[in-house]
Amino acid sequence: MKNSPVAKLIGAIPNRLQLAGGWIDQPFVNQHNPKPPGSMVVVQIAPDFRPMDRSGIASGTRHIAMKLWKGKLPNRPPEELARALYEVENKGKAEPSGSQDMIGLVYPGVNRLDYDFKVQGGVFPSHIESCNSPKVAKWLSRVLHLLPVEPRPDGYNPLGVKNLSPAWVAKLGQSGQDCYDAIVKMDAKKLGAALNLNMKCWETLLPHVVRHPALRVELIPILKAYQQQYLGAMYSGCGGGYLIVVSEKPVPGAFQVNVRVAQK
């Protein structure tokens, strides 16, 4: 399929999926963590579909990477690639994108990113724990279901209200740890619980992530319904995008992704 018309259109650079713990990569959040490091999980997924723009799949970062590296990841250490991409994307930005966007694109497999404000100012992880087990990747590809909801609209800013309670920042970082542990153990129930905890943290810390006058869709009722019916659910990013549902059974209307692991 590498030479198919769709593959040529999309390009060879992977996509990235953010799971539990997102926002802990931002120094304005992780500086309030009383129990550092706080963790989050990113997953590299195959570029076999075109994601909606402005939907939490790091399509903006990937677009920059496509231009910077002419459609293909260079054969260099992923840490080096992530830092280079971070510098290019955030040059002159008042509100820089978090480093998880870049790391998720260039690190294969499932990655737990540990952030500590005392290490590199909380901009880059103090440690990255990676899982490139084909068995785990196949399992995760089977239990994650993406349901398109709606891209975040123009004029939307998720940072209008910040309730950065240290206790809730600690819970956010713990949701990432729980998420990674559940994936490595292939425990769908605990994975769903980690995604649900992540959403409680987002709703508490940064309420405009899920509630905002510019949003045309009521995100919370959709989230709650899927959390009640399935093992767990979270939005792919601020303002909606996709609803990521954890289920060992099919989810009508959703599609599945292919988790990429390091090639031996």
Q: What are the language-model segments listed below?
A:
Residues 239:
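Glycine-rich nucleotide-binding loop
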